[in-house]
Amino acid sequence: MSDRWISLVAIDPAKERCELDFSAGQRDVVADTNLVYLRHLDAWSKKWDNGRIEIKDNLQFSKLVYGSLYYILISLPSDSTYLPTNQFFGLSPGGLANGANFTDYQGHVFWDMETWMYPGILMLHPELAKAMLSYRLFSMPAARERAVAGGYDGIRYPWEGGSTGAEVTPDICIPCRENQQHITGDIAFAARQYVSATRDLQWLQTEMGYEFIREMAAFWVSRAEEDWNNDTMMYNINGVMPPDEYQISINNSVYTNIGAKLSIMFAEYAACLAGTAEDNAMIEKWRHVAENIYVPFSEFKRYHPEFEGFEDVTGDRKIIKQADAILTGFPQMWSMPEDVRRNDLELYEKITDHGGPAMTWGMFSIGWLELGDKNKAREFFHKSYSPYVREPFKVWTEAQSGIGAVNFITGMGGFLQTVLFGYGGVRLRVEKLEFDPEIIPGTSGMRLVGLDYLGNSLNIDVYEEVIKIVKTKASEHTIDLVTSDSKIKFILHSGKIFLLNNV
């Protein structure tokens, strides 16, 4: 017979109220130890019913998926409190529990939150994704100071952020602090995803959402103007560190530059949604800069060099730390021919450090799924989690060797993206939601419970031959179902089951 351990924690800014809450909890335990446990179960059941991923006929893999989502959710604000919630200060790579001096990234917030943890949460728990973005809105004054200090317009976010939103990257990595400017593009892309998934006009119009988007675009416009090239008649973004941190300072990172272009382009779209009348001259300036930011591309080899001059690099500098240029295919979803996508994957697979972080291999898996190569996708999918998970509690480590950040929720977020956007086939576009699922090897299918889009919730069951879709919650936004082999639109009504061939 196993023992049941009950742990009570009360957290409140007011000591007296905190003590009262803790005493009330103690009384409940004394009165009925099962009562607290049942309340705990009920709270988590409601959370899971709002959004989860079920794996069919593979218990161990189910535990891994549930565990990954659980560890991220417990680091996010509670949705059932007796008091108004305080400002949320973001997710660190090691979650809320980790962050000692010079270990586990000291609890600081990086691009990890928006790029790796946020996308899966947005599709399953959009209210929590909004809370994640709220940290960046809260820290806009500090981001504005960061931009002004560099001589730029708008807002520039720090590589490592803390409770004030100021730059807190330690001196052990000054190049990271100064050169990893892509984080502002990453945050802008997260805002783009939020608007695409929710059409939250209140957030855009009255909660500073549009200002947030506009000011990030303003930073990129001024940043690109600094490096205008009269010879090529293109805007450059020089002196940056890309996601591949083995490159300290390079020019025209393909990932950074595409992030900048997308940020500026979306600002005009967001202005229309928000009903904001921007100056025509400003709009024209945005368009000119966005259209003319240089994107490295080899016409001869038909692939995206990681940065300008990449093809001339030799020796150790040719080794890539982690996924970089392949991120242009996903999550950035930059339009490219199939052969270019394939060439990017094949080239960078050969030169990526095989001891790198888990997220890298998940992005390769997603890429190969896009191209229909199930064997390659399976190979990289297995590599994206197997070496990083520690039993028995499914705790992840940053490195395969077990060192680095512990309970590495960044890796868990990347893994969940491979499940949801890779095998789930979900693609969140600005004007539509697409999905083209595949069966995860070793399972008989999956179920997406509470997939949220425009205020509607969907349950989607994916089997080998059939896909079942049910709308479980409706909003003022009606959503139509259009299959790839038909131009006929089916209006999704609540409770009505749609069965589709999964071929």
Regions found by a protein language model. Give the residues of each.
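The feature captures the catalytic groove of carbohydrate-active enzymes
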Residues: 4-6, 13, 17, 93-109, ...
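Helix-terminus loop motifs that line ligand-binding clefts
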Residues: 76-101, 127-189, 195-196, 201-205, ...
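Well-ordered alpha-helical scaffold segments within catalytic/enzyme domains
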Residues: 49-53, 70-75, 115-126, 187-201, ...
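A ubiquitous short alpha-helical element
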Residues: 26-33, 174-179, 249, 348
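Acidic/polar, glycine-enriched structural segments that form the non-catalytic walls/loops
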Residues: 1-104, 498-503
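Non-catalytic C-terminal accessory modules of carbohydrate-active enzymes
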Residues: 172, 375-503
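Active-site core of glycosidic bond-cleaving carbohydrate-active enzymes
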Residues: 106, 111-138, 189, 207, ...
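Alpha-helical packing segments of well-folded alpha/beta enzyme cores
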Residues: 7, 40, 64, 71, ...
